[in-house]
Amino acid sequence: MRSQFKDEHPFEKRKAEAMRIRYKFADRIPVICEKVEKSDIPEVDKRKYLVPCDLTVGQFVYVIRKRIKIPSEKAIFIFIDDILPPTAALMSKVYEEHKDEDGFLYVLYSGENTFGDIPGVEEIE
């Protein structure tokens, strides 16, 4: 899926900004968070985040939930490179494994599991 942030900012500018952020804030990760295009969930009010390295994916999801003001009973899923990362994973580990060549970590969020079933989870009737 194409990133709106990438469309609006040239590669060299994004790369320079990510490098500047990593140099100035060594304990933080530059993250771009955007809504999956066809999701019915609200748009987040800002898409650029400086995330502490020791934050978990679950804690980051909580931050996004608060920013888009959705009720706790509504599901939210985040995707990085079309995968659903484990909620206990540290953002620093996810960043090292999935950062873009421009230095940002691109996160998509949706109100539904857009990319299909979660492996290993079976439905019961």
Curated annotation (Swiss-Prot):
It comes from Komagataella pastoris (Yeast). InterPro entries: Atg8-like, Ubiquitin-like_domsf. A lipid is attached at residue 116 (Phosphatidylethanolamine amidated glycine). Interacts with ATG4. Interacts with ATG30 and ATG32. GO terms for cellular component: autophagosome membrane; cytoplasmic vesicle. It is found in: Cytoplasmic vesicle, Autophagosome membrane; Vacuole membrane. It is a lipid-anchor. This is Autophagy-related protein 8. Coiled coil: none annotated. Its main location: membrane. Disulfide bonds: none annotated. Belongs to the ATG8 family. Signal peptide: none annotated.
